[in-house]
């Protein structure tokens, strides 16, 4: 009898489909999370005051900042209320993170230029590929 009642209750539970944008946001989150870890691991293993040049550092001054921005972007999308594309509160957090880390990435570029010369970072983007 108890089994029949439980079966009936379990059958009445409706599982909502996960929106494609949420699945995409989760995939972006996982990509950014793994790559940010790789960037931090690489930086931790560098000889003191050497120019990082492998992996994403080949193209970006601060790829770990890029990954951080992607983490916030993916959370803003995954956490969006039903019927909207993004969560406004998390989007505000993203704006703060992009601004804060953008300034820091510019400072990092300046330091690299002083330490290693302009040619060492000439072809690298600060933080956002093809934009900044």
Model-derived features: where do they sit?
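Glycine- and acidic-residue-rich phosphate-binding/metal-coordinating active-site segment common to enzymes
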Residues: 8
């Amino acid at each position: 009898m108890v089994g029949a009642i439980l079966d009936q209750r379990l059958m009445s539970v409706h599982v909502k489909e996960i929106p494609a944008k949420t699945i995409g946001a989760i995939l972006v989150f996982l990509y950014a999370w793994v790559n940010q870890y790789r960037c931090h691991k690489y930086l931790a293993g560098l000889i003191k005051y050497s120019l990082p040049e492998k992996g994403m550092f080949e193209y970006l001054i601060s790829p770990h900042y890029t990954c951080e921005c992607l983490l916030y972007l993916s959370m803003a999308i995954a956490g969006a209320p039903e019927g909207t594309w993004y969560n406004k509160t998390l989007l505000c957090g993203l704006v703060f993170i992009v601004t804060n880390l953008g300034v820091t990435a510019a400072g990092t570029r300046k330091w690299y230029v002083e330490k290693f010369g302009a040619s060492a970072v000439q072809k690298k983007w600060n933080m956002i590929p093809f934009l900044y």
